[in-house]
Design a protein with these regions (language model features):
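Aromatic, loop-rich ligand-recognition surfaces of beta-strand-rich domains
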Residues: 1-43
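Accessory carbohydrate-recognition regions in carbohydrate-active enzymes
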Residues: 40-323
Length: 323
């Protein structure tokens, strides 16, 4: 009579399944769903069931978020396509990484970190600092992501707490490590403007950035505050604002304008702007970075970092994120 029929079998361990249809008529046969699960005895770790790649081929900017915990405020992931709908954010079919935004939410995004090496012209934006990657050199798990950036010959690992992102980079060659922090321009679902960054220590930064351009709802402007710690002192900090670059700085303040590209579309244009943290590193050396965020003030971002991730034990945070 057309109503749904559910057939449940008693639990049984098997190596092969065969389905035979006895009451259908060739091409008119309809089958809505078959669910087959591994034996629970073989998978006591329920997190191992999770496949973060699901819906990463035609999803949205905020669908694939490996650097996040359930109900956590921090939500980082590599970005391969800088758009929202129809395969934006991390897309499994892509071959290039444009950066690692720290915020992936509905109509909220920003604070893009890009580990690189050598002399980078940041005024070219993400097309100037992007890197090729391969799934053969990638590991994706809930709360953890590892990927090799081919153009820079370095490994990037990321994990997180509820409000802090934790990165560990390993360099396979002697190099000038060039870690870019982009705080300007369109990213996924909103546009970053009016960035402000200050150096507060030999290996510390703090600042804020405004996000605008939300077509599908939300406040006119949302400000994100952040505190950023490196585990090695800076050799030098450089900055850029649109087409202007400056060497040996202690901060950056940008007054940028976001303009709608097309009326009625969730896309605003604004120049890129940010900071480059430079370190001279040897082959095999690691560089670690922590970024804490807050939507209220810098003091709370600093509190989040001290309360949730006061140490430099990356693997401990990774294990805790998997629980």
């Amino acid at each position: 009579d057309g109503t749904a029929k559910v057939v449940e079998f008693a639990p049984k361990t098997t190596k092969r399944l065969r389905f035979e249809v006895t009451d259908g008529d060739g091409p008119t046969l309809g089958l809505s769903e078959i669910e087959v699960f591994p034996s629970p005895q073989d998978y006591p770790d329920y997190v191992s069931y999770v496949d973060p790649y699901i819906e990463s081929a035609r999803g949205r900017y905020f669908f694939f978020v490996t650097g996040s915990r359930p109900f956590g405020m921090f939500s980082a992931a590599p970005m391969t396509r800088n758009k929202n709908q129809y395969g934006g954010g991390y897309n499994y079919n892509s071959t290039e990484i444009l950066g690692f935004p720290q915020v992936h939410c509905w109509m909220l995004s920003g604070i893009t970190l890009m580990p690189a090496t050598g002399d980078i012209d940041p005024t070219k934006g993400e097309q100037g600092w992007k890197s090729r990657f391969s799934h053969n050199e990638e590991l994706v798990q809930p709360g953890y992501h590892r990927v090799f950036l081919n153009d820079y010959k370095l490994w990037v690992e990321q994990t997180c707490t509820d409000r802090v992102g934790f990165y560990r980079m390993k360099y396979t060659e002697d190099c000038l490590s060039n870690t870019l922090l982009n705080l300007g321009g369109f990213t996924g679902t909103s546009t970053m403007t009016d960035a402000e960054v200050r150096q507060t220590g030999p290996a510390e930064l703090e600042g804020s950035v405004s996000t605008v351009g939300r077509l599908w709802g939300g406040p006119e402007e949302v400000k994100i505050y952040f505190v950023m710690h490196f585990d090695k002192p800076f050799d030098r900090l450089d900055s850029w604002d649109d087409s202007l670059t400056t060497k040996a700085v202690t901060g950056l303040k940008v007054n940028s304008q976001a303009t709608p590209r097309n009326a009625g579309m969730t896309y605003y244009d604004a120049p890129t702007a940010g900071i480059q943290a430079l370190h001279r590193l040897k082959k095999g050396e690691e560089l670690q970075v922590k970024i804490a965020i807050s939507y209220t003030n810098i003091e709370n971002a600093r509190h989040n970092l001290a309360h949730e991730c006061a140490h430099w034990d990356f693997d401990a945070i990774r294990r805790d994120a998997r629980r």
